[in-house]
């Protein structure tokens, strides 16, 4: 199963980008041993439309254009379900074992995600009730994906 993060906005050079890349590389090393075929991050350009609904619609169209048939769509949204690390790992493991071709995680821009896009998601996840900057959400998601791989591998990184 291939993993893809579609993130609206660009992560500039700096500590957040370095940390995100570190977790992505760690996952690649471990994930391949677990049957995952890699983890990619694609940045979606932020819309320049004047009104929020138009921005969300443009960003949603760019996101949907990258969703492959049969892939599981997971949105990151403050209204989503808060999953513990072990539950998240178990879900990724189930999708892998069901031979889902890919899982696509979507991180919206400043205006959030178009409701129609949220409805297409098999799972909507939240990192708690707080609103987080998309740069932090990307790092947090990459860390949780890496942590999920360590849980599936029985690696001591996750000490619950």
Swiss-Prot record:
List membrane-spanning regions: none
The source's superkingdom equals Bacteria
InterPro entries in alphabetical order: Alpha/beta_knot_MTases, RlmH-like, tRNA_m1G_MTases_N
Disulfide-bonded cysteine pairs: these are none
Q: What is its EC number?
A: 2.1.1.177
* Pfam hit, one: SPOUT_MTase
Please name the GO terms that the record assigns under molecular function. rRNA (pseudouridine-N3-)-methyltransferase activity
Q: Where does S-adenosyl-L-methionine bind?
A: 76, 108
**Catalytic function, reaction form:** pseudouridine(1915) in 23S rRNA + S-adenosyl-L-methionine = N(3)-methylpseudouridine(1915) in 23S rRNA + S-adenosyl-L-homocysteine + H(+)
Cellular component per GO?
cytoplasm
Query: Localized where?
Result: Cytoplasm
Keywords of the record, alphabetical order, are: Cytoplasm, Methyltransferase, rRNA processing, S-adenosyl-L-methionine, Transferase
What is the recorded function of this protein according to its Swiss-Prot or TrEMBL entry?
Answer: Specifically methylates the pseudouridine at position 1915 (m3Psi1915) in 23S rRNA.
Task: Relate the assembly described in the record.
Answer: Homodimer.
Question: Hey, which family's this protein in?
Answer: Belongs to the RNA methyltransferase RlmH family.
Name of this protein:
Ribosomal RNA large subunit methyltransferase H
The scientific name of the source species is: Rhodopseudomonas palustris (strain TIE-1)
What's the name of its gene? rlmH
